[in-house]
Amino acid sequence: MPIDNAAAWNRISGGEPGGVLPGIDSVQYGPDIAGESEFRLLGSVERKRVLELGCGGGQNLVALAKQGAHAIGLDFAPAQLAAVKRLAEKEGVRVELHQGPLSELPFMRADSVDLVLSAYALGFVEDLNRVFRQVHRVLKEGAPFVFSMPHPAYDLLDDDADDPLLIRRSYFDRSPVEYAWDGQELSDHHRTVAEVFAGLCRAKFRVDTILEPEPRVDGPRSRHWREPFRMVPRTLLVRGRKEGS
């Protein structure tokens, strides 16, 4: 039976912000890597309409709102959205929230968004190409789509094994990657870097940035840290800009 990621995240949230992203003052892209303050992929978001796909616990959405954005969040897990609402109220910012699949954006008009962001959520989506088409539809001409996702090379490893660098599966195996998170079973859809790039191009995005961030070399480690982070990229970070209509 396929894993129900939405139900799992409803249980994981436990009424509090969840996920892999720390902090609420700056946009973060993944565990134990630098964030927007270093990568500078978004530009100024002040007075911009910004849509986050898979807003999770709301840390990035609140950070965007604090910087003056009209922050719009979409998530498939109602319990996560409830946690986002509480976090936004606590921080004294306003956010707009929607519940539904990340591949469906009926609440957004065409050419109405200045920026779309997604951090570690697109792996849960089965039809990634539909997400790309929907994002292209709602973005303004030339506007950026910035997203991070689990790096497909890291999917090959079992980082809880005695030998975490032992390859456990083929890079070309498209079956979902199943794993445990806070006691719940989750799954990510595995795609190669080439497939992600080709999907963006078919959806009429011009890709100008692909990053495989190295982990932070100093400072505290998150609870998600694994030693293989030092040798195999954990996160794939991409920016594309809308071209055409």
Give the positions of each predicted feature.
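Conserved class I S-adenosyl-L-methionine
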Residues: 1-46, 59-63, 87, 144-176
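Class I SAM-dependent methyltransferase SAM/SAH-binding core
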Residues: 49-53, 57-104
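A short acidic, Gly/Pro-enriched loop at the edge of an enzyme's catalytic core
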Residues: 107-115
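A short SAM/SAH-binding and catalytic strip from SAM-dependent methyltransferases
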Residues: 114-129
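A short glycine-rich, Lys/Arg-flanked "PGG" loop and its adjoining helix->strand segment in the class I
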Residues: 129-144
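Acceptor-substrate binding/catalytic loop of class I
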Residues: 149, 153, 180-195
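Short alpha-helix
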Residues: 186-210
